[in-house]
Design a protein with these regions (language model features):
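A glycine- and charged-residue-rich anion-binding loop/surface
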Residues: 1-172
Length: 172
């Protein structure tokens, strides 16, 4: 979220402004955003390829991830998901992006959001060893998985028929 505070006057196109970024808030939000990509990949590995992202929310306090799945997650499944994400975090692998043609990105196996419209050139995000997570994403991210700290799922719920939600934390 970007907030603008005007001390006086108004803004118009081509005006110069001073930008102040809350570094701590941005870094925590980046960490939770990056963690959502690891969560998505872990969910697919534990529950199956039918899992698709249906929504997410990231901020400096937590992450929320909505996904397609018909049943409540068992304690064993939650534990497996947490373990997979934390294994990638402990590897301290590089997080990288590259610009690719949309078709090349899809052919490489990069996940895209169903119904989302993309330009001909897209940004592909790779997280973890052997592209543990490979998705189209234009957001900001951490540099290495180790920057995430410990990951834990704090809750799960149903938000609609066939749509599950998990909330989680990542950090030191």
């Amino acid at each position: 979220m970007h907030l603008i505070k005007l001390d006086k006057g108004s803004l118009k196109i081509d005006d110069k402004i001073e930008v102040n970024v809350n570094k701590e808030k941005r870094e925590r939000t980046e960490a939770h955003h990056s963690a959502t990509h690891l969560v998505h990949a872990a969910l697919k590995r534990v529950l199956g390829d039918h899992v698709k992202q249906k929504g997410s929310l990231v901020d400096e306090h937590k992450l929320r991830f909505d996904f397609s799945h018909d049943e409540s997650l068992s304690d064993k499944e939650i534990s497996k998901i947490e373990d997979l994400v934390n294994q990638e975090i402990l590897k301290n692998s590089a997080v990288s992006t590259k610009i690719m043609d949309l078709e090349d990105a899809k052919n490489s196996g990069a996940e895209s959001l169903f119904g989302e419209k993309y330009e001909d050139q897209v940004r592909v995000l790779s997280i973890g060893e052997d592209d543990f997570s490979l998705e189209l994403c234009g957001g900001t991210h951490i540099s290495r998985t180790g920057d995430l700290g410990i990951f834990i799922i704090t809750s799960q719920s149903s938000v609609a028929s066939g749509i599950r939600r998990i909330e989680a934390l990542s950090g030191p």
